[in-house]
Amino acid sequence: MPEFLEDPSVLTKDKLKSELVANNVTLPAGEQRKDVYVQLYLQHLTARNRPPLPAGTNSKGPPDFSSDEEREPTPVLGSGAAAAGRSRAAVGRKATKKTDKPRQEDKDDLDVTELTNEDLLDQLVKYGVNPGPIVGTTRKLYEKKLLKLREQGTESRSSTPLPTISSSAENTRQNGSNDSDRYSDNEEDSKIELKLEKREPLKGRAKTPVTLKQRRVEHNQSYSQAGITETEWTSGSSKGGPLQALTRESTRGSRRTPRKRVETSEHFRIDGPVISESTPIAETIMASSNESLVVNRVTGNFKHASPILPITEFSDIPRRAPKKPLTRAEVGEKTEERRVERDILKEMFPYEASTPTGISASCRRPIKGAAGRPLELSDFRMEESFSSKYVPKYVPLADVKSEKTKKGRSIPVWIKILLFVVVAVFLFLVYQAMETNQVNPFSNFLHVDPRKSN
């Protein structure tokens, strides 16, 4: 009866499959993890070694004597399944020492997303990393770093050679089995990469607090908008009655919305007619905005009180110093001034689009030749044409008059020709009249004596 391994995790997945098929064990459908085949090996094959255990046999230890012929088919998966099982049993003790640490790490391999911030910090310190503060934004980065360190640790363990006793050819064959164990470790590394697909719950968990915060903010905003400040008057007898100003405000409010001041007036007695003469204080609703109406404490006699409703405006400054109280007339004047200013702006800029800030911007023209833009001649031609057509607004009067006179002296061409013909005819007539006249003043010059010339 062949002896089977007590720790089948030494074998690779392919060897486990071949052993199970050789011993007529039905395998599960589809591709399964190595742990599934290890469990099948323990249930069906390792269980066969248990009956001889009470007799004092040690299944974990290697056999005392074994021939080389039995160990030769160890690296080859084939017909010698029984001999291969014996040889693996011989190497079992040594190989389990190597693979104990990865198995223990697999047991300790928890989901990184389930670790708390302190546990994650401890794991990083174990790997020699000095992390900073772990918060919601940096947690993902440290989780990725921890996964990388675990992968590197498993790869370094699989790549480091183990010291072996080189006394005979048997030890060399044991080293061959160690190589197969190394290959099994590589398969486990690939499984760790498959475990990285569990990062999807990271996104879900990161999103859940955001949604909870949003819900809380919306809930708080609804409460802050529902906050109401009420001022109630309780009049007693005709002689006097206590004046109580009850201010009620919601305690739960969003952090960003400014809190309102809660003021409680002191209890004091006031005559009945004084209350009737004074202006009644209505209920003021505290809105979620920064401005609110708060009734100041009333001191002294009500007879000298003026019908002025003080208004305190709270700004966004942490101290929230109240501003100077304003009367109703001043508030009305300010609103009228604002309206007038708005009308003036609309009159000055009628074609400007109205914006909430009152600031309008126009597109900037690009600088020619800047930022490596090519120079285009068309731009310069446009400039020349514009400069030639440019006409100054202010021209001296003398130039304008000269231009008008020049335009008025311009004579049509046919009038010029007519005048030329008239002048020519006049000169011709004058010449003819001079020839017919005997007393010609130029006759002495025309008829020269030839003798004088000789």
Swiss-Prot record:
Domain LEM span(s) in chain numbering: 109-153
Keywords in alphabetical order: Acetylation, Citrullination, Cytoplasm, DNA-binding, Isopeptide bond, Membrane, Methylation, Nucleus, Pharmaceutical, Phosphoprotein, Signal-anchor, Transmembrane, Transmembrane helix, Ubl conjugation
Gene Ontology CC entries for this record: cytoplasm; membrane; nuclear envelope; nuclear inner membrane; nuclear membrane; nucleus
Segments for region (Linker): 49-108
Spans through the membrane: 411-434
Region (NAKAP95-binding C): 300-374
Modified residues (Citrulline): R320
Region (Binds lamins B): 299-371
Subcellular location, principal: nucleus
Biased composition (Polar residues): 155-178, 220-237
Modified residues (N6-acetyllysine): K207, K389
Compositional bias of kind Acidic residues: 107-117
Xref: InterPro entries: LEM-like_dom, LEM/LEM-like_dom_sf, LEM_dom, LEM_domain
Record field: compositional bias (Low complexity): 78-93
Compositionally biased region (Basic and acidic residues): 97-106, 179-203
Tissues expressing the protein: Expressed in many tissues. Most abundant in adult thymus and fetal liver.
Record membrane topology: Single-pass type II membrane protein
Chain positions found as Omega-N-methylarginine: R86, R88
Record-listed Phosphoserine modification sites: 59, 66-67, 79, 156, 159, 166, 168, 177, 180, 184, 190, 222, 224, 250, 254, 265, 292, 306, 315, 362, 378, 385, 402
Region (NAKAP95-binding N): 138-243
Quaternary structure annotation from Swiss-Prot or TrEMBL: Interacts with LMNB1, LMNB2, BANF1, AKAP8L, GMCL and chromosomes. Isoform Zeta interacts with BANF1/BAF and may sequester it in the cytoplasm.
Protein family membership: Belongs to the LEM family.
Function: May help direct the assembly of the nuclear lamina and thereby help maintain the structural organization of the nuclear envelope. Possible receptor for attachment of lamin filaments to the inner nuclear membrane. May be involved in the control of initiation of DNA replication through its interaction with NAKAP95. Thymopoietin (TP) and Thymopentin (TP5) may play a role in T-cell development and function. TP5 is an immunomodulating pentapeptide.
Protein name: Lamina-associated polypeptide 2, isoforms beta/gamma
Organism in which the protein naturally occurs: Homo sapiens
Top-level taxonomy: Eukaryota, Metazoa, Chordata, Craniata, Vertebrata
